[in-house]
Amino acid sequence: MSCIKNSFEALKAKNEKALVGFVTAGDPDFGKSVEIVKAMCEGGMDVLELGIPFSDPTADGPVIQRSSQRALSSGMSLPKVLEMVKIVRGFTKIPIVLFGYYNPIFSYGGKRFYEDALAAGADGVLIVDLPPEESAELTSLWEGDDFDFIRLVAPTTGQDRMKQIAGEASGFIYLVSMTGVTGSQGLDSSKVADVNAPLKAVTDLPVCVGFGISTPEHVKAVAAVSDGVVVGSAFERLIEENLENRGLHTMVQEYTESLKAATRG
């Protein structure tokens, strides 16, 4: 059984929903990024999404685009992301999901990526721009059930397409709360419930909702209609606004604690 599946089952037993946190690996630099992740873990994060910096992150809003630029400017690369995973795995047991675009993974080599990510301590991957019909060649290189492939479902996805995506997914499904790019505003939890219901009809996998979630109130509302909540741009905004602030570690930890408290039933 995968680490991700174990984690969701343990949370369900405690009547809690998962808090999934995203940060770009290497933002603003390698050392500070490790400390930021440590603060998230100390704050009670359940699942960590580590973004692989990319020069053309088209699905992301300006906040995460700038985080990618800062990470790349500091010398971050996919091999260094995997090095960071090893370090993070040394101080936490929570699932680590690598989050990014296909180009860096393709350049690195699919089989090599799987083997090195697994060896580093990663538990899965979410590739934003790789739909199921284009991913068979990559996933055929992977063996066993210890490395999950998380899939995205949009609010505009039809029932048949949902079923296809869910059939190709493992770990959990990332349900996008609204159309647009990461960091978009205008969250409506009732619309999330409307999309989640048909999705849950075709899969037993946990469904985690992201895009536009930044406050404990958002988390509480979305957690009531899903299995987990993804917060990304809000973490990156906090980092961006406090790049030179020595209290950033404490700020990230306390922010994480406030979000996590809202996931408890």
From Swiss-Prot:
Segments traversing the membrane: none
Functional pathway: Amino-acid biosynthesis; L-tryptophan biosynthesis; L-tryptophan from chorismate: step 5/5
InterPro entries: Aldolase_TIM, RibuloseP-bd_barrel, Trp_synthase_suA
Amino-acid biosynthesis listed as a keyword: yes
Gene Ontology cellular component list: cytosol
GO molecular function: tryptophan synthase activity
Catalytic activities: (1S,2R)-1-C-(indol-3-yl)glycerol 3-phosphate + L-serine = D-glyceraldehyde 3-phosphate + L-tryptophan + H2O
EC number: 4.2.1.20
Keyword Lyase: yes
Recorded superkingdom: Bacteria
Pfam families documented for this protein: Trp_syntA
Catalytic residues in the record: E49, D60
Keyword annotations of the record: Amino-acid biosynthesis, Aromatic amino acid biosynthesis, Lyase, Tryptophan biosynthesis
Subunit structure of this chain's protein: Tetramer of two alpha and two beta chains.
Job of this protein: The alpha subunit is responsible for the aldol cleavage of indoleglycerol phosphate to indole and glyceraldehyde 3-phosphate.
Family: Belongs to the TrpA family.
Descriptive protein name: Tryptophan synthase alpha chain
Species, as recorded: Desulfatibacillum aliphaticivorans
Upper classification of the organism: Bacteria, Pseudomonadati, Thermodesulfobacteriota, Desulfobacteria, Desulfobacterales
